[in-house]
Amino acid sequence: MKTIKTIIAAALFLFGAQAIADEGTVRVLMTTSQGEISIDLYLDKAPVTAANFLQLVENGDMDGGSFYRVVTYENDRGSPKIEVIQGGLGDASEGFEAIEHESTEQTGILHTDGVISMARGAVGTASTEFFICIGDQPGLDYGQPRNADGLGFAAFGKVVSGMDIVRKIQGLPADGPTESDYTKGQILTQPVSIGRVRRAD
């Protein structure tokens, strides 16, 4: 009986994953205090990561989040240096379930200009925090040295409108408090609020 239940559960999971992938690309609109950003989520290419973000959107969990960190070639202390803006729920992210890591090798979504990807510490710890690439950032892809484990970050979509807003956010003053020398000069003095994120279709 237990085996049958396991088979049924696995079948339902696969059916759900296929249903998500069948949606292909879903566009979401992110309204911030600096302007609007439109993002395409690639559910067919990154079904786990994109579906997680879409679920956060549909649940209203991303509403009230913020962009709080900006990384430039001048203030970055990693190697290779990158340029991104990071956002999400920040301290409010506790309690959200982490997701499986989908590498760029699996999805084929590379970290090019405008690509949105999940921030993480160890593999399999990503949940609500994300970043948007400014310019091409190949050092964030699978097999590259930016992350010590070599697995890169999980890209899952791309900005299709509003990169001017992304760059505007990156240029804001960043002398906010931080407990880490690594992020000194990267924390926005005034975080950019995310008022609402919703499906555009």
Spell out what each predicted region is:
Residues 16-201:
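Cyclophilin-like peptidyl-prolyl cis-trans isomerases
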Residues 8-14:
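Hydrophobic helical h-region of N-terminal Sec-dependent signal peptides
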Residues 1-8:
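Bacterial N-terminal signal peptides that target proteins for export
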